[in-house]
Structures are given as structure tokens and as C-alpha cells.
Design a protein with these regions (language model features):
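Short glycine/proline-rich turn/loop motifs
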Residues: 1-13, 148-155
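Catalytic donor nucleotide-activated moiety binding site of glycosyltransferases and closely related
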Residues: 1-8, 20-68
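N-terminal core-binding DNA-recognition domain of tyrosine site-specific recombinases/integrases
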Residues: 13-21
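A structural signal for well-ordered alpha-helical segments within the folded catalytic domains
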Residues: 23-26, 69, 86, 90, ...
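Surface-exposed alpha-helical segments enriched in charged/polar residues
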Residues: 26-30, 34, 73-76, 172, ...
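Short low-complexity, flexible loop/linker segments enriched in glycine and/or proline
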Residues: 54-58, 114-119
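A donor-sugar binding/catalytic signature common to diverse glycosyltransferases
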Residues: 71-118
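Leloir-type glycosyltransferase catalytic cores
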Residues: 115-190
Length: 190
């Protein structure tokens, strides 16, 4: 959405394989809220909305007060970033904030920058056999460095988004990691 809006003279369809609907995060947002976190959806342009009516959730990306500066500010002050591997995910990393990426694609992306936190990646399905590929099969078929929707079509595979349940389970893991880090820091200072 961001690229299509600001750089209109070029087609960005080749990035479509990275997209996923915001509705897939609804269970996870509710989980974070149940755990007393405030959840702020960032981004200057976004598609879709979550139907969540809770004072601990703010869809800043669809608000009238959004700005690129405020995106940077919010991500510099957040406790963690949890979301997709679009360009904005690099901001919390640059502020040394924990960041947990979902629907990461291509697989190579989870190794592309120094990472201290886990990520989950999209599964890849062989359209000919209808089989989900193993990591070894992805490597053997050179799918770890596939960067366009057209390349995936040529290789006769599709990317499958992480399910709502997989994303929620990853969120549980993320909070466990943060809690362990906090406990370790507290133990050092006691």
C-alpha cells in the first residue's frame, strides 16, 4: 500500500507475495490486550481494519494524527514490535527494540540482518504435488532467495500465510522471551 501510494509510476505487484490481511492478527491483538499491553498499529498507509473496541488498542495507521515522524517516535519507545517484514520493521531494530516478525518471506529474510529474536516465515506449497515444502526442499529449489511474485509462479509454488493460531502461539512465545529477559535484568540489578 505504501509503495503503491507514494511511488505510483511503478507497479509494485512483484511484492504481493509478502502481503497478508490484518484480520489474521485479531486473536493476537486480543491476547496482547488480555496481557495488559497497549497495542498500536503503526504505518502511514494500511489496508483493512480490525474490529476491536478496546482502549488498549489504537489503529494509529488509520487515524487523522499519523505521520512518518510519529511512526519513528512510537517505534523508538515501544516495548516490542510484532508484525510483518515490511520496511517499517527495520525501525525498531535500529532503536534496538525487540522485534518479532510474522509471515516472513522469503526465508532468506530471517537471516538478512542481525537478529536476536525469532521470526516465523510463510510456508511454501508446491502447486504440482499440493505438498508443503520442508526447509531443505526450499533450499534445494532455490526458494530462499526468491523475491518476486512472478518468480514464485514460475517455480510453481505459492506462499501460505501463517494462520491466526500460529501467529497467536508466536505471540505467546514472544511475551515469554520478553518476560525472561526482564527477569534476567531484574536479577542482575538486585
Amino acid at each position: 500500500t505504501y509503495l503503491n501510494n507514494f511511488l505510483r509510476d511503478k507497479s509494485w505487484e512483484y511484492h504481493d507475495y509478502r502481503n497478508f490481511p490484518i484480520k489474521d492478527l485479531k486473536k493476537t491483538v486480543n491476547y496482547f490486550i488480555e496481557k495488559n499491553y497497549f497495542v498500536i498499529r503503526v504505518g502511514s498507509l494500511s489496508e483493512g481494519k480490525l474490529n476491536i473496541s478496546n482502549n488498549r488498542y489504537f489503529d494509529y495507521s488509520n487515524s487523522d494524527i499519523k505521520s512518518d515522524f510519529m511512526d519513528c517516535f512510537l517505534l523508538s519507545k515501544c516495548e516490542m514490535f510484532f508484525g510483518g517484514s515490511s520496511g517499517i520493521c527495520l525501525l525498531p531494530a535500529s532503536f534496538r527494540k525487540p522485534y518479532f516478525l510474522i509471515n516472513n518471506c522469503p526465508l532468506e529474510g530471517i537471516f538478512s540482518i542481525k537478529r536476536n529474536y525469532p521470526a516465523i516465515f510463510k510456508r511454501i506449497k508446491n502447486l504440482k504435488t499440493n505438498k508443503i515444502l520442508s526447509i531443505k526442499e526450499m533450499i534445494d529449489r532455490d526458494l530462499c532467495n526468491t523475491y518476486t511474485s512472478e518468480e514464485y509462479k514460475i517455480k510453481n509454488v505459492i506462499n501460505l500465510n501463517n494462520s491466526e493460531q500460529e501467529i497467536k502461539e508466536f505471540a505467546i512465545e514472544a511475551l515469554n522471551i520478553l518476560e525472561c529477559q526482564k527477569k534476567n535484568r531484574d536479577d542482575v540489578y538486585e
